[in-house]
Amino acid sequence: MDRAGRLGAGLRGLCVAALVLVCAGHGGRREDGGPACYGGFDLYFILDKSGSVLHHWNEIYYFVEQLAHRFISPQLRMSFIVFSTRGTTLMKLTEDREQIRQGLEELQKVLPGGDTYMHEGFERASEQIYYENSQGYRTASVIIALTDGELHEDLFFYSEREANRSRDLGAIVYCVGVKDFNETQLARIADSKDHVFPVNDGFQALQGIIHSILKKSCIEILAAEPSTICAGESFQVVVRGNGFRHARNVDRVLCSFKINDSVTLNEKPFAVEDTYLLCPAPILKEVGMKAALQVSMNDGLSFISSSVIITTTHCSDGSILAIALLVLFLLLALALLWWFWPLCCTVIIKEVPPPPVEESEEEDDDGLPKKKWPTVDASYYGGRGVGGIKRMEVRWGEKGSTEEGAKLEKAKNARVKMPEQEYEFPEPRNLNNNMRRPSSPRKWYSPIKGKLDALWVLLRKGYDRVSVMRPQPGDTGRCINFTRVKNSQPAKYPLNNTYHPSSPPPAPIYTPPPPAPHCPPPAPSAPTPPIPSPPSTLPPPPQAPPPNRAPPPSRPPPRPSV
């Protein structure tokens, strides 16, 4: 299948890959609850079918079957290779699950026999890896080799050489040794000692290492954060997955971005951990561009593919949000202006409301006990005896006498009766069916409700204060206008009495009054008006014509003398 078909199959598995975001450990779990791997790479099983495993081939088959079912990525390809005197490829590299099922059936029918030529199996694997790389795919490869015996010196040399050749092509080599194996030989054939899985308890114990093999051999990419970026902006991506430190050298780990299935850009990560990578990402300038995320464990020699796609979108600079907030604040300001403007522009005079009528103490419905006050027999006030006036009882309050008692003078022989109980508790009210109303139990939210009610009352009072001041329909008024009135004659500042020796002193400003009209001498009893004092140096007030007085009606107006 070509690369485009493989990518299409990977896109179909996008929904499956999204489920692993909630999984932990080695990547995820299958429907039956067992561990699973979602990595997209090429997996090669190289199995020993020499005569030493003749009676244990069923255990080997079930081990391979269980392990193969744990790799469930649609992008994973698998191949079965057996070796004895020579190597045979039972199933070539494929991701077709039906072909994998048929390959497992062929594997079950294998009849073991022959010598242990492990290098023959590595040769068959290297041939396929080389062919796939020549096609331009460069997919990461994982080899799991199983044997049960010790290799002779020459066979060990050839096996190590072919394993190194597979590594040079980008493969990661794991070895499984059963019972009578040489662990030192397998450590040199595999990538390291950590890549060797010993099974000392025989072939029956192969099922117990499936989880360990899956955890160490699985290299998977589960997610990328962020998955959507802004076009034309630089960013960093966090690659979530497993097995990123399984490489022989973590310094050779690379993040790869395949843009629109055409251009591949490799970036060295800032941090490499077993479960995540922190990588710089290339700048995608156009909206709608897509970058498929890949990881290389060998400095770009081969890549582990995934279904994780990073897309670009258009991002605003925040101006729309700023404009929206500005419009919102303007609307709020207009609403406040509409509410408070009539308070500034309308003068309203309202009648003083009548004083509130004080409620009687007897009508107190708060349910609190009422205090009893001493009573005084008022028959002894001013009546000179018991039959003097009508008997009247007066209640004395805690701040002195009540209004009735304040009008009377307490007599010496007044009888004061103290109440038996200081407080009088109200009787419980009965319902229509003569049943008493049960007291409401205190809820857990009662304190919170009380505080909220108090806050609501405070806000309501503030609203009512402003609402009362607002003009009602029909109220009239006008705004206060401040205007400047221009005077026709500017005011003159009075002259100061400053002495200038070079100039003569100015003459006092004085205008003699007009001659008084001739009037008959007044009666002797009338007092003589005082003589006006001479004017001072200050300027006199502005002269105005004397007011015209109307003559008495009993005599004609006087004539002026000639």
From Swiss-Prot:
Pro residues composition-biased segments: 502-562
Localization: Cell membrane; Cell projection, Lamellipodium membrane; Cell projection, Filopodium membrane
Recorded superkingdom: Eukaryota
Domain VWFA residue range list: 42-213
This protein's UniProt keywords: Cell membrane, Cell projection, Disulfide bond, Glycoprotein, Membrane, Metal-binding, Phosphoprotein, Receptor, Signal, Transmembrane, Transmembrane helix
Positions on the Extracellular side per record topology: 31-319
Intrachain disulfide bonds: 37-218
Glycosylation sites: 164, 182, 260
UniProt GO MF annotations: actin filament binding; collagen binding; metal ion binding; transmembrane signaling receptor activity
Coiled coil: none
Renumbered residue ranges of the record's region Disordered: 400-442, 490-562
InterPro entries, per the entry: Anthrax_toxin_rcpt_C, Anthrax_toxin_rcpt_extracel, VWF_A, vWFA_dom_sf
GO CC, any one term: lamellipodium membrane
Lipid bilayer topology: Single-pass type I membrane protein
Cytoplasmic-side positions: 341-562
Modified residues annotated as Phosphoserine in this record: 360
GO biological process: actin cytoskeleton organization; blood vessel development; negative regulation of extracellular matrix assembly; substrate adhesion-dependent cell spreading
Free-text function comment from the UniProt entry: Plays a role in cell attachment and migration. Interacts with extracellular matrix proteins and with the actin cytoskeleton and thereby plays an important role in normal extracellular matrix (ECM) homeostasis. Mediates adhesion of cells to type 1 collagen and gelatin, reorganization of the actin cytoskeleton and promotes cell spreading. Plays a role in the angiogenic response of cultured umbilical vein endothelial cells. May also act as a receptor for PLAU. Upon ligand binding, stimulates the phosphorylation of EGFR and ERK1/2.
Assembly, per entry: Interacts with gelatin and type 1 collagen. Interacts with the actin cytoskeleton.
Family assignment from sequence similarity: Belongs to the ATR family.
Protein known as: Anthrax toxin receptor 1
Organism listed in the record: Mus musculus (Mouse)
